[in-house]
């Protein structure tokens, strides 16, 4: 379905520079877009692509349109039509959502015959329950929820209105998922936290005893508009709940330990690991494969770059890095050799300083 720029602006705002009746039926990158597609410029370093794109129209910020120079109607190359908006990237995201919704007919409400639903569960008439879904006693499935094939919902768990669980996602007993959650395939919410008490006697080969499992009797509470990536795991609390606040976005294969609290609007990239009882503030950004130790607190607006390790609390907003970026292999070997010899170099410097001091050289 194609829409005019005028229709888009009525729905999403912005100003038109060019032909308001220009129609676009989809989105594409600047370097691949055709005359019936809408592109966007989010990074000024790609401004040259705007000049050469074949897109029917481009989403662009006012300052970037000024840099582009020529007026829309007077251009002889590149697009003649623009939607001018302060945040082209967010505008693009909303338009993309709209096109997806228009192209995807809603599934009919109902329960697939192969689903297993306990008589004590409550399932809204508007819910969509797919093949081989299991819903245990006391669970509540609210209006408009979609549970795809093989989803498991444990006893006493509530799934908020408008949420969508993709195939093979699982949410254990006693959890609360807020409205409009998106939970991708293979994600697990509410599995046991990693809690074991040591009960050992003796040392070495004479050591006896074992690890005693600590029952995890808390749950998981997830706020509205949260998205959880594929194969991500969020452990239930040991006594109190693990809490994911509103509008948190979690990538694939992330581990969140028991009793964590993730503040609203925080984003966590793939393969990050967050140990138990850690609190992360609001509007934080956690890079891919970052590791955060347990029992630490990150303040609001903290950014942890990819592969960084966090071993202590970081209460102040800012960007924190501990990862070593990739370099030429030979350079790495040289640096590693220097690191191994730092203690020897330190002792040599101390000896030289002492010798200079003995000779009065430090006064020179």
From Swiss-Prot:
The EC number(s) this enzyme carries: 2.3.1.191
- Copy the pathway line from the protein's UniProt record: Bacterial outer membrane biogenesis; LPS lipid A biosynthesis
Superkingdom classification of source: Bacteria
Report disulfide bridges, numbered on this chain.
none
Q: Which reaction does it catalyse?
A: a UDP-3-O-[(3R)-3-hydroxyacyl]-alpha-D-glucosamine + a (3R)-hydroxyacyl-[ACP] = a UDP-2-N,3-O-bis[(3R)-3-hydroxyacyl]-alpha-D-glucosamine + holo-[ACP] + H(+)
The record's listing under Pfam families reads:
Hexapep, Hexapep_2, LpxD
Question: GO terms for biological process?
Answer: lipid A biosynthetic process
Write the record's keywords in alphabetical order, separated by commas: Acyltransferase, Lipid A biosynthesis, Lipid biosynthesis, Lipid metabolism, Repeat, Transferase
Q: Which InterPro entries match?
A: Hexapep, Hexapep_transf_CS, LpxD, Trimer_LpxA-like_sf, UDP_GlcNAc_AcTrfase_non-rep
Enumerate the GO terms in the molecular function aspect: N-acyltransferase activity
Statement: the UniProt record of this protein carries the keyword Metal-binding: no
Sequence similarity:
Belongs to the transferase hexapeptide repeat family. LpxD subfamily.
Describe the subunit structure.
Homotrimer.
Q: What is this protein called?
A: UDP-3-O-acylglucosamine N-acyltransferase
């Amino acid at each position: 379905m194609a829409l005019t720029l005028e229709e888009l602006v009525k729905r999403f705002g912005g100003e038109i520079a060019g032909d308001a009746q220009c129609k676009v039926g989809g989105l594409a990158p600047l370097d691949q877009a055709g005359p019936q597609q809408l592109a966007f410029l989010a990074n000024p370093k790609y401004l040259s692509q705007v000049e050469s794109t074949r897109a029917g129209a481009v989403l662009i910020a006012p300052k970037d349109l000024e840099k582009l120079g020529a007026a829309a109607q007077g251009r002889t190359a590149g697009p003649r039509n623009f939607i001018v908006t302060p945040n082209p990237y967010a505008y693009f995201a909303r338009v993309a959502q709209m096109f997806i919704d228009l192209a995807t007919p809603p599934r009919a409400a109902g329960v697939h015959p192969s689903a297993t639903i306990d008589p004590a569960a409550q399932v809204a008439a508007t819910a969509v329950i797919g093949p081989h879904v299991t819903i245990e006693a006391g669970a509540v499935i609210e209006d408009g929820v979609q549970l795809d094939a093989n989803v498991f919902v444990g006893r006493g768990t509530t799934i908020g209105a408008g949420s969508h669980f993709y195939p093979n996602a699982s949410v254990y007993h006693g959890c609360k998922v807020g409205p409009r959650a998106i939970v991708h395939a293979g994600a697990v919410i509410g599995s046991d936290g990693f809690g074991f008490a040591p009960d050992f006697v003796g040392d070495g080969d004479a050591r006896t005893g074992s690890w005693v499992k600590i029952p995890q009797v808390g749950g998981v509470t997830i706020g509205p508009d949260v998205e959880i990536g594929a194969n991500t795991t969020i452990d239930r609390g040991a006594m109190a709940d693990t809490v994911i606040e509103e509008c948190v976005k979690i990538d694939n294969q992330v581990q969140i330990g028991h009793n964590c609290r993730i503040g609203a609007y925080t984003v966590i990239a793939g393969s990050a690991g967050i140990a138990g009882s850690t609190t992360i503030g609001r509007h934080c950004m956690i890079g891919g494969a970052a590791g955060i130790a347990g029992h630490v607190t990150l303040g609001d607006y903290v950014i942890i770059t990819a592969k960084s390790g966090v071993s202590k609390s970081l209460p102040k907003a800012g960007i924190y890095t501990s990862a070593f970026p990739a370099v030429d292999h030979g350079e790495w070997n040289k640096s590693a050799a220097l690191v191994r010899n730092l203690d020897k170099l330190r002792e040599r410097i101390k000896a030289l300083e002492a010798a200079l001091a003995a000779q009065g050289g430090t006064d020179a």
